[in-house]
């Protein structure tokens, strides 16, 4: 069985959202699975001094234009959220709690959270919003509400973020295939070719 592709993303990352609509199908063409791994860009920014794209003069305006253009090309619904960026510890904690019980459901939750934020302009940062979205995809409401207050669930996310940083992950989306890193949704075609050829 071929190694899975690790897909690192932040729920507040629009390019992560775009990549999330393509990565599973791309991997399947090569007989690969995908491990979805939300992390927190805020933790990375504290280390390397980056700031969100939207807040960078000139680059922010271009990014908004590029995102809309890229979404049209991919035929993916997209609207830059009115509240952007947001903190995403809560949806990320929910993801890992669900993932530890039912990985396939966790992936559906991630897709629903991304769609709510970047297609429907819904702020997903609060426990109430996250739980409402999770309930719609089949997650038990009461259990998730309780889990989000559990220190062990918070520690689980912290461990994932630390592990991602230790691995060199600094952006979203960020992919690792057979030890080879690729950063950015614009590297998916390169990743596809890497899998097709075995690398170069």
Model-derived regions, located:
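Structural alpha/beta surface segment adjacent to cysteine/selenocysteine redox centers
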Residues: 11, 15-117
